[in-house]
Structure formats: C-alpha cells, structure tokens
Design a protein with these regions (language model features):
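Solvent-exposed loop/turn and edge beta-strand elements of beta-rich ligand-binding domains
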Residues: 1-330
C-alpha cells in the first residue's frame, strides 16, 4: 500500500446510487505525494453493497490503473575543467546532465534550468536577466539523461558558489494531449506536494476509461484548469546542499613581500627574493592546482626581464579545504 509523506496509507471512497446498470463514478485521492518521486502507483478499487464485496479491480499490471511519478537528478560540470569548478571569465560554459526516471516514452518534455546564488538564494544575472537554459526532448525510454547547456559571463561571480536548479515539464502539445485521450499512458503525471488522482470506474467493474486530475500549485505558474495549460510541471530538482548541482567560482588575492625585509620594499641586488602569498577561496578540496605568477613592470605593464627571461614562478598544491593560502616564490 502506498503511503503519503505523513506515513498514512493512501485510500479513498465514494458512495453511489446508480440510476442504470452501467455507469461511472469518480473516486478522488487527495494526498501529500512529495515522497513519491520516481514511484509508479496503481489504483486498486473494490465495490461493496451493504458491506459485502461485489466487485474488484486490482491488477498491478493494468496500465489503465497506473499513475507514473517522474523523478530527476542532475550533475553540473564546467566544460573546460570537467569538474564543479569554473573561472570568473567572460565565456563560461556549464553542462548540466539531467537524469530522469519514470517518464512516458514518445511524449515531449522540456527541462528548464536557472543558475542560483547559493548565498543569496536568488538567480544570478547577466545584464539584468536571469541566467537560464533549457532543452526539449522526446525520450525513447522511461529512464535516461538529457543535457542542459548554460553559457554566460562569470566575470562578476568570483568567490561565488552557483547552484543549478532544474524543472521538468510535460509539454501539452497536440501530439501529447490528443493522440489518444482514453490512453492512460499519455496522461499527465505530477509529483506535486498536493496530488489528486481521479479514477473513473463503472458499476459493472469496467475500467476502460480512466482519467487523472492534478491540482497544480499556482506557485509553479500552472493554472488549475489543466485543459488550458500548455505545460505541466512534473518534477523538480532544487537543492542548495547538493554538491552535484554546484559550481564553484574561485577567487584569489595576493600579498607580495621581500623575503629578507618582510615588507613591500627590497634591496636592488642580484639575489632578490620575493614571496607572493596567494589567498584563495572557493576551491574544490582534494584537487591539485597550480599557481603561475609573473612579475610585471608597473610603469608600462610589460613583464620584468632578468637574464633575458621573464621573471616567473609557480607552485603546485592540493587544496585540503576550499579556503587557504599558498606561497609563490620569485
């Protein structure tokens, strides 16, 4: 027996006084289905007369009795680094791979993503517009993946942690909505917190006509009248604590000092030694990094040359934590 988010068995009933031998009656199930993402639900029905069982329809394999509740999970990776780390550049590309479960093959779906700021819990923007991306697809199997590709400028995002939110919609176009109105396999299924499924059953235990009704939350911009809507929200993956949805944009600051004086001044000698302490934040711990430094002439912006070569230095390190320091010695 399916249980709702409160641990209660999902049941319902309806009383009827039929005027004819053949007919229909709706049995409405209203429950918190927030715990059922990825589940397949089958509605079993009994008809009783004076508390005596006179009819049963309980076929676990009957598609007409079946409701599918999709589920999605995502993993966002930077196109260049291949990990959950991007640079604060003009042209950042992030691919969010959405893994879906329990869709109906042959129907059209749209997955829509938004880049969120983990600290402010608001969408990140470029030019005053939210950073979004989407993909429309028609799955060949119930379970699979689809990529959502984001391209944006991250120049202003140094030090920020981005979380990619995804929503999955069933597109109610002509092919989806009208291909076969009596086929339950092409009806709308949604894991909304408040879910209402209506099973139509006649009094002679016939179940050839089944319809699903979904109460849609206005917060999701879906009107309650599903006949008017072009899309229905069927799955959401929005978790600020999910590392798979997270992209970090590092930030570094440096402090250069003469090794002998410990200040920003040094004596003009042949064996000058400068220690540039690089403070970093928002790295992915456990990964290996390399800091590359170049001494630049402030008067003209050109590299400082010594013995015919640019004055450079580098340091490799494995970040134990997201925030820390490393010395680059020139």
């Amino acid at each position: 027996v399916i249980k709702d988010a409160d641990g209660k068995a999902v049941t319902s009933e309806a009383e009827i006084t039929p005027e004819t031998a053949d007919g229909k009656v709706d049995v409405d199930f209203i429950f918190d289905g927030s715990n059922l993402a990825g589940k397949t639900i089958v509605m079993f029905e009994e008809i009783r007369y004076e508390d005596k069982l006179v009819g049963v329809h309980a076929d676990i394999n009957d598609e007409a009795q079946t409701i599918y509740v999709p589920a999605i999970a995502t993993e966002a990776l930077d196109e260049v680094t291949g990990i959950h780390l991007s640079n604060a550049g003009d042209d950042v590309k992030v691919k969010d791979t959405v893994t879906y479960k329990n869709l109906i093959q042959g129907l059209t779906y749209r997955v829509a993503g938004t880049v969120m700021d983990k600290d402010t819990k608001k969408p990140l923007q470029n030019g005053g517009k939210d950073i979004t991306a989407e993909a429309v697809f028609t799955p060949e199997t119930a379970d699979g993946t689809v990529d959502v590709e984001f391209t944006f400028s991250a120049k202003e995002f140094a030090g920020k942690t981005m979380v990619l939110f995804e929503k999955l919609y069933l597109v109610k176009n002509a092919d989806n909505a009208d291909a076969n109105p009596d086929d339950t396999s092409s009806k709308d299924k949604t894991p909304d917190d408040t879910q209402k499924a209506s099973e139509s059953e006649n009094t002679q235990n016939k179940t050839d006509n089944t319809s699903n009704k979904v109460e849609v939350d206005n917060e999701n911009n879906n009107p309650a009248d599903n006949s008017e809507v072009k899309e229905v929200l069927i799955a959401v993956h929005e978790d600020y604590s999910d590392e798979n949805q997270t992209i970090c944009v590092p930030q570094i600051k440096t402090t250069a000092k003469d090794a002998k004086s410990g200040t920003s001044m040094f004596y003009a000698e042949k064996s000058a030694k400068i220690v540039d302490t690089v403070s970093y934040r928002n790295l992915v711990p456990g990964k290996k990094y390399k800091v590359v430094g170049t001494a630049v002439d402030k008067s003209n912006g050109a590299p400082v040359i010594a013995n015919g070569n640019n004055v450079t230095a580098e340091a490799e390190f494995v970040a134990k934590e997201a925030t820390g320091k490393v010395d680059v010695v020139f």
